[in-house]
């Protein structure tokens, strides 16, 4: 239901004069190559990037970016003076109240318990902390796009990559848009890397960008598969062959258009263990873990990096470790 609030705000923005991507979306629709679900995902993606400045979701909810309840609507509700005052002055409180008040597809309220608590004790609730917990304490932009089976999730990632590069090349100093990309294929699927890369390589950017821009951007793309298992022979730079592939693209300052694909397991340390306090830390001297650490370090050096995790639900118990790795980047 949080998604419902985002979509409502997105539609309002898209129909306003502030939205400058209408022609771009119209072009995508005119090509007839993208499914409706993909178009809607792209609209939402650009709304979060442009209108919302690519800020973390918890911050956007706390700032009332998706609030739609008006003062008139609040005044018509049975609320105490204190509750109404807090909802009118605290955007995070209003966001949480609006979320809990929504109805699902069955007509059931999302959380009667939560709205009742806000009505009874609005001054005792730490609204910002609640939103941080909802979004797992993530303090960077982290968006999940869930499409139906067969709706083209990998193509959608490719579309996002080209769209980011399009805006990044227009405004190199705009940090909202990525210049380089790492795609983490499911660690549980050993043969998923090559198909993922091939799908992205074969994606026709003219589906989302007009020519000659589409072809110009594609010519600047660099694709790397980081799937080597064995250490390379002695080298002055590194013993990890996957790191060698990245090192060839130095200096990184002006690097733009790199798309690297690897299995999630390549960057997850088996030696990541949980301390009593709940934190993950490294406790291993295994070669595999040293190589994973080295690869993570070099990936983290890539400028304006966007991380795509493909079907992360396949990672099972590895998803917690993977989140820890992404947090460090």
Predicted feature residues:
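RecA-like P-loop NTPase motor core of helicase/translocase proteins
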Residues: 1-329
């Amino acid at each position: 239901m949080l998604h419902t609030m985002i979509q409502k705000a997105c539609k309002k923005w898209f129909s306003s004069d502030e939205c400058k991507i209408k022609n771009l979306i119209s072009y995508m629709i005119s090509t007839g190559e993208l499914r409706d679900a993909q178009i809607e995902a792209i609209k939402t993606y650009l709304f979060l990037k442009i209108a919302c400045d690519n800020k973390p979701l918890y911050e956007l909810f706390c700032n009332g970016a998706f609030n739609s309840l008006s003062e008139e609507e609040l005044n018509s509700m049975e609320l105490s003076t204190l509750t109404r005052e807090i909802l009118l002055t605290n955007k995070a409180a209003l966001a949480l109240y609006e979320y809990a008040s929504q109805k699902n597809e069955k007509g059931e309220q999302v959380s009667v318990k939560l709205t009742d608590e806000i009505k009874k004790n609005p001054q005792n609730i730490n609204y910002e902390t609640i939103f941080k917990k909802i979004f797992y304490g993530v303090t960077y932009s982290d968006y999940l796009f869930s499409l139906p089976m067969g709706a083209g999730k990998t193509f959608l990632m490719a579309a996002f990559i080209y769209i980011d590069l399009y805006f990044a090349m227009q405004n190199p100093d705009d940090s909202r848009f990525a210049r380089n990309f790492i795609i983490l294929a499911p660690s549980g699927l050993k043969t998923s890397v090559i198909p993922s890369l091939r799908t992205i390589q074969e994606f026709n950017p003219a589906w989302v960008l007009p020519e000659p821009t589409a072809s110009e951007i594609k010519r600047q793309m660099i694709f790397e598969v980081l799937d080597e298992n064995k250490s390379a022979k002695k080298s002055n730079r590194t013993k990890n062959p996957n790191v060698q592939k990245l090192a060839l693209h130095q200096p990184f300052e002006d690097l733009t258009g790199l798309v690297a694909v690897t299995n999630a397991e390549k960057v997850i340390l088996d030696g990541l263990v949980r301390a009593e306090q709940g934190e993950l830390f490294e406790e291993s001297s295994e070669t595999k873990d040293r190589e994973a650490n080295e690869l993570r370090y070099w990936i983290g050096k890539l400028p304006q990096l966007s991380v795509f995790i493909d079907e992360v639900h396949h990672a099972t118990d590895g998803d917690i470790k993977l989140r820890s790795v992404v947090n460090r980047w």
